[in-house]
Amino acid sequence: MFTMPRGVVRLVGALAFAAFLVEGALLDWSALFVTGSLGFAVAQGGIGYALFSVAMTAGRLTGDQVVKRLGGVRVLLWGGVLVAAGFALLLLAPAGWAALGGFVAVGLGAANLVPALFSAAGRQRAMPEALAVASITTMEYAGILLGPALIGFVADASSLRAAFAMLGALMLLFPLLRNRVPTAENA
């Protein structure tokens, strides 16, 4: 059952939307970026998403230890910074193979953002926990569904590189808003 998010749940849901927007955009557009912008052969088009996925999986599997060591606020800070830096590497690296490291950085940085946001859903007091989780989940899946279309719209109006730059800039919301998200350090 979907309930309109209230209070801090709106912020947490908006950040989850942004995180899943990036995941959806990479799922649908990374192969075109790898072949069109980085100059790889069509047969190698999937390498960017593969690197992103492996890095995200490794990050999620070690996420509990990362959160215990850094805390939720720092996970949001450094996760967002690492994703933005990954997009910068994708866009600015002088060679295609070096740019692929950007996909790894995006995967590692994004890996624990959404899990940290779900933890925040359990710490907030604006609405019942189950309804907060339902609202956040709905918002994040809207991001994964709308993300590819939004990237296509931006790419058509300008370029895929500009769309990827927009994604990197969007992920800077995590470090900027990290102290407003309920974590163990600030709840």
Which residues make up each language-model segment?
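Intracellular juxtamembrane helix-capping segments at the cytosolic ends
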Residues: N112-R125
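Helix-to-loop junctions at the C-terminal end of transmembrane segments
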Residues: G59-G72, A155-D156
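Short amphipathic helix-loop junctions that connect adjacent transmembrane helices
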Residues: D28-Q44
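Small-residue hotspots at the loop-to-helix junctions and early N-terminal turns
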Residues: V42-A50, A130, A134
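Structural signature of the two symmetry-related core transmembrane helices
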Residues: R74-L89
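Pair of pore-lining "gating" transmembrane helices in MFS-fold secondary transporters
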Residues: R6-V22, V104-L108
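Paired small-residue
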Residues: G86, W97-A105
